[in-house]
């Protein structure tokens, strides 16, 4: 059986990332949120919802966030 990993790049999404992670966990075995330099609680909320969290210290853009996620696999 194959395993599914979802990569979710995020920047200042504390108000929505929790529900996105919870919804995604229904379909994926592993959810990784790449916090792209957020200045809010995005990383904390994502972790509380059950995601693994990778962090960029500053915003580098969606492409860089996805690259970080793919490199973590």
What is the role of each PLM region?
Residues 1-73:
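Structured catalytic core of nucleotide-sugar glycosyltransferases
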